[in-house]
């Protein structure tokens, strides 16, 4: 477009800015449009060409379907692997927890048995001491009675 095709008309002038209107002159009939108004005519397709296009489309559909099925199979395989790993980790955790609990129970049992053995030993020592005191008392008592008379 040439600059003669455009007219600028000032509307307002303010401190905040300027308002104006652009007036475009109508196109001259001599100028050629830059793009065609209608799409180019398509050539008539033969039966063979139509058949080839249909076969190519069918091949693309089959290829796409095969790709989708492959992706689904890979996804299922991944899900199986994840599930198997989770089950294995759960089993390992259960096994470790059971071993830990068993070890703790054995330690408690040994501790309890050691405490019981210590109590029995103290009771035996006490009984032995009581028996010694009784013997000492019996051996002293007859002597004390004769001396008192």
UniProtKB/Swiss-Prot annotation:
N-acetylalanine modification, residue list: 2
Domain SLD: 4-145
Top-level taxonomic group: Eukaryota
Compartments, as annotated in UniProt: Cytoplasm, Cytoskeleton
Entry-annotated residues carrying Phosphoserine: 4, 16, 25, 31, 38, 63
Modified residues (N6-acetyllysine): 9, 100, 119
Region annotation Disordered: where it falls in the sequence: 104-149
Cysteines engaged in disulfide bonds, as pairs: none
Modified sites of kind N6-methyllysine: 29
GO biological process, one term: negative regulation of microtubule polymerization
Bias kind Basic and acidic residues: ranges: 104-143
GO CC aspect terms: cytoplasm; cytosol; membrane; microtubule; neuron projection
Post-translational modification, as annotated: Many different phosphorylated forms are observed depending on specific combinations among the sites which can be phosphorylated. MAPK is responsible for the phosphorylation of stathmin in response to NGF. Phosphorylation at Ser-16 is higher in the developing axons from hippocampal neurons and seems to be required for neuron polarization.
Quaternary assembly: Binds to two alpha/beta-tubulin heterodimers. Interacts with KIST.
Reported function: Involved in the regulation of the microtubule (MT) filament system by destabilizing microtubules. Prevents assembly and promotes disassembly of microtubules. Its phosphorylation at Ser-16 may be required for axon formation during neurogenesis. Involved in the control of the learned and innate fear.
Protein name as annotated: Stathmin
């Amino acid at each position: 477009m040439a600059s003669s095709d455009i007219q600028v008309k000032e509307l307002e002038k303010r401190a905040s800015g300027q308002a104006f209107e652009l007036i475009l002159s109508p196109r001259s009939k001599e100028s050629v449009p830059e793009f065609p108004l209608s799409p180019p005519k398509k050539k008539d397709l033969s039966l063979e060409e139509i058949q080839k296009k249909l076969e190519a489309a069918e091949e693309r559909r089959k290829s796409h379907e095969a790709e989708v099925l492959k992706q689904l199979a890979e996804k299922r395989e991944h899900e199986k692997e994840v599930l198997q790993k989770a089950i294995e980790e759960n089993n390992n955790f259960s096994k470790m927890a059971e071993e830990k609990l068993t070890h703790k129970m054995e330690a408690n049992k040994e501790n309890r048995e050691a405490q019981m053995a210590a109590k029995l030993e103290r009771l035996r020592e006490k009984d032995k001491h009581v028996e010694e005191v009784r013997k000492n008392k019996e051996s002293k008592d007859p002597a004390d009675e004769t001396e008192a008379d």
